[in-house]
Amino acid sequence: MTVTQTLQTWTVAETIIGIAGLAFTLLLGLLVGCASRKPDANELSARGWVDVTATLDPGTTPVYEGDAPMKFEFLKNMRTGDNFTLSVYSMGAHSGTHIDAPQHFIRTGGSVDQIPLEALTGTARVIDIADGVQAIDAAELNRHDWKGAKRVLFRTRSSLRSWMASPEFHRDFAYLAPDGAQLLADAGVALVGFDYLSAEQFGAPAPRTHQILLGRGIPIVEGLDLRPLQAGDYDLIVLPIKVRGHEGAPARAIARRTSASR
């Protein structure tokens, strides 16, 4: 090999190394940028589980009018000199995100510990209800793509206004009208969820919505925080505290986009 050929070989090699180094630098920068950027709620809902449980806090969590007030206190507290911390929670069974079991309005209905796990876990459809809609009746329901859904979650004005993160109780929350409840029950849904403290109209003369759903054995999840979600299908897990013989209990709820929706 001549000197000229040797120099040409070195030049080609240096060029290849330079290009490879530049590509590595760009890739590293991209990875670092992706790792340091915090994903927004929509990305989280597309990539993994999202907590749709309202945080329990006496200072920020609303309580249904007339229900037991929420009170948390420390019996022992390491911050005040004790050698361990011990808390007591006092609140109603229907505080924050919670489950209504059939026993809530049906005398012979099952208690919260008897709700089948199959009803509480599986695919759910989030329905976006416009801010101006308060009564979700059969006509309103049929304006949305809900048919075929096994579980239906309503994202209403309560999510748009962050009412589950505000201590003030609002009477004008959106609710499911009895004919809407009948439509869902007749379609065989396994669970219905709401983003405020009740699925029933405040001050309704009779609890027909609860009676229709719970009478069919359909549990109701109330007090969900659906702000991070958009309309669409999700995998849903709702697990209430296992309290024997009672009509309801606080629950933890998580959701993620179904693989078909990602």
What are these regions (language model features)?
Residues 1-13:
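N-terminal secretory signal peptides that target proteins for export/translocation
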Residues 12-14, 18, 29-262:
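Active-/binding-site microenvironments in catalytic and ligand-binding cores
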